[in-house]
Every structure is written in structure tokens, then in C-alpha cells.
Amino acid sequence: MAITPTQLLDWKRQQRPIVALTAWDTAIASVLDAAGVEIILVGDSLGMVALGYETTLPVSLDTMIHHTAAVKRGVQRALVVCDLPFLTYQESPAQAMGSAGRVLQETGAQAVKLEGGHPRMVETVARLTEVGIPVMGHVGLTPQSVHQLGYRQQGQDPATAEKILHQAIALAEAGVFAIVLEHIPSELAASITEQLPIPTIGIGAGPQCDGQVLVTADLLGLTVKQPPFAPAYLNLRHTITETVHKFSGEVRQRQFPRRG
């Protein structure tokens, strides 16, 4: 049975940690789903990790729909959440509704994720949730605001910490079913987690969040530059390189294919 946003709320009350990872294709999505991952996020980070862009900004809605549909075809149980990419929801609630509607109708994903917690974004979230579109929030470091905020840790001083807290509370009141807390001090994340009735999903936000999310390529050691808050559990880049070298050597020495 597929996981629902309501189950995540139950797990928050039960203090059961939630596991989330990213996927952009059917193969990886099916592995994550079979391994018991509860949330599979089709993140616009695919622009940087899979498509070679320097930021997430060039990623289009059509690209996200293409990859989310591929992910959903490989998933039976996990909750699939799709990032709405840059400038596909910020203009107005009507624009956001059109983008979110396309995602849900064309991919089968169960929810969308929006970045930011300023008043207009809170209004947009409220409009989406009013019509039954499940929304995941995202505050702290928001990659779509890279040219304004950069990639540094957010919420380090009392004023910005208070701002992030108030944004998280406002988003929860607007109806998000969960919220990503990215690259903020662990004390701030713990405070937000304690005050919100919805699950917090941390990435570089300490261990006290209700769940954790990582970019799967970072987890597996596929990326060239590892984020400071994302330790690699495997050096898959090295493993793939060695495997390709072995295959190449056998081809060049005419040892492949082996005579059976």
C-alpha cells in the first residue's frame, strides 16, 4: 500500500524517523522503494547532478514531469514528491496551481514541493492545499534563491533564525504536510521540529528532525564535490571506474565476450 501524507503525520506523533532520498529514473527509484525508503523526492537538484548545470535554475517543468513520471513507474510504496522548478510557481497562486496540476495529472506523483516561506508563498501554499494538492514546504537554504542567498548555512544569527522559524510555522498553518529544513543550525531545526505538528525533514540540519533526506548521488559517492553535510556511505564513483577499466581491458585483450 502506498504511503500517504497522513501516515507521515502519524509517524511524527509516534516519533518514528522518516527516510527520504532523491531519484530521477525508474531504476534507482525501484531500488529505493524496495529498500524501504518512505519518501522519494524528484528534486530539481537533477539539474546540477544529472544534467550538468551549475545551479537548479535552468530546470524546466517539462523536465521535472519527464523524470517524475519515470520515477513513479518504478515505485509501488513510497510517497513520490516532485519539486516545482524555478519560476513555475512564484508568479501567482494560479501559476502554481497550473504547474502542480500538470505534475499530479501527468506523472502520478502524490505531492509537490515548493521553496520559500515569505507571505506570498504562504498564500500560494494555502490555495494549493485548499483544492486538495498535497504540498511539502522547504525553508532555510533554498537553492532556487542561490543568487540572493548563496549556498551558505542559513539562520546563524538570531534575526534570520527567527525569520525561518516564523516561515515554518506559517507554512504549517497554510497546510503543508511536511517541511524540508536545509542547512540550518541543528538547534534551530530542533526548535522548529518541536513546535510544528507536521514532520520536519532535515538535510544538513542536525539529527533532531523527524526525518532526513539526501541526494542519492551524494549518499553513494557519485558526485565529484561532496556537500559538507552529506557523507558518502559508498565510493560508487571509484567502483564504477574500476569496473569500466576491467571491462575495457577485457575488450581490448579480446577476452570479452568469453567463449561459452
From Swiss-Prot:
Chain sites annotated for binding Mg(2+): 44, 83, 115
Catalytic function, reaction form: 3-methyl-2-oxobutanoate + (6R)-5,10-methylene-5,6,7,8-tetrahydrofolate + H2O = 2-dehydropantoate + (6S)-5,6,7,8-tetrahydrofolate
Any single biological process term in GO: pantothenate biosynthetic process
Named cofactor requirement(s): Mg(2+)
The UniProt record lists the keyword tRNA processing: no
Localization annotation: Cytoplasm
Enzyme class of the recorded protein, top EC level: transferase
Active site residues according to the UniProt entry: 182
Pathway where this protein functions: Cofactor biosynthesis; (R)-pantothenate biosynthesis; (R)-pantoate from 3-methyl-2-oxobutanoate: step 1/2
GO CC term, one of those recorded: cytoplasm
Enzyme Commission no: 2.1.2.11
Molecular function (Gene Ontology), one example: magnesium ion binding
Keyword terms: Cytoplasm, Magnesium, Metal-binding, Pantothenate biosynthesis, Transferase
Residues the entry annotates as binding 3-methyl-2-oxobutanoate: 44-45, 83, 113
Keyword Magnesium attached: yes
Free-text cofactor note: Binds 1 Mg(2+) ion per subunit.
Subunit structure: Homodecamer; pentamer of dimers.
Function field: Catalyzes the reversible reaction in which hydroxymethyl group from 5,10-methylenetetrahydrofolate is transferred onto alpha-ketoisovalerate to form ketopantoate.
Family as reported in the entry's similarity comment: Belongs to the PanB family.
Listed name of the protein: 3-methyl-2-oxobutanoate hydroxymethyltransferase
Species of provenance: Synechocystis sp. (strain ATCC 27184 / PCC 6803 / Kazusa)
